[in-house]
């Protein structure tokens, strides 16, 4: 992350603005019938990222690189009910694919990953689906 922020500062003209939007997966609130399984699936998902929690340190990293951070805002991704065309629906499929392919390193079988996915669909059918995840927007100038 340090290298990317420094490179952004290098290529941006003096006075230029940068907007970085990133997710902190610790902010997730996702209803599940099996909380332990949900934790295992999300722990597996964290492996696909170099850092699953960058917003907590991004502002300081940007300042160290020479940026002036003007504003930090939160962009919630909220699905209080099932919506087939939504971030939640899309990320469910993506996580299922990743966890099915990489879950064995975390003790997750393909069947357990599918059970996680099916649980979410059952919750949706019963009107009990809930998903929320925060993204953070950092506006800065060089």
Predicted feature descriptions by range:
Residues 55-59, 114, 132-136:
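Short coil/turn segments at secondary-structure boundaries
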Residues 65-68, 85, 89, 133-142:
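Core SAM-dependent methyltransferase catalytic element
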Residues 2-17:
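A short glycine-rich, Lys/Arg-flanked "PGG" loop and its adjoining helix->strand segment in the class I
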Residues 71-129:
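C-terminal helical/coil "lid" or tail adjacent to the Rossmann-like core of SAM-dependent
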Residues 17-84:
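Conserved catalytic/acceptor-binding region of the Class I
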């Amino acid at each position: 992350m340090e290298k990317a922020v420094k490179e952004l500062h290098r290529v941006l003209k003096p006075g230029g603005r940068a907007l970085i939007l990133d997710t902190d997966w610790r902010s997730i609130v996702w209803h599940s019938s099996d909380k332990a399984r949900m934790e295992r699936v999300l722990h597996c998902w964290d492996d696909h990222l170099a850092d699953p929690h960058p917003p907590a340190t991004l502002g300081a990293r940007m300042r160290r690189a020479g940026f002036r951070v003007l504003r930090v805002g939160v962009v919630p991704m909220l699905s209080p009910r099932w919506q087939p065309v939504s971030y939640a629906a899309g990320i469910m499929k993506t996580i299922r694919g990743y966890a099915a392919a990489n879950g064995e390193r975390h003790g997750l079988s393909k069947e357990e990953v599918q059970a996680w996915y099916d649980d979410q669909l059952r919750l949706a059918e019963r009107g009990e689906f809930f998903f929320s995840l925060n993204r953070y927007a950092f506006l800065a100038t060089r």
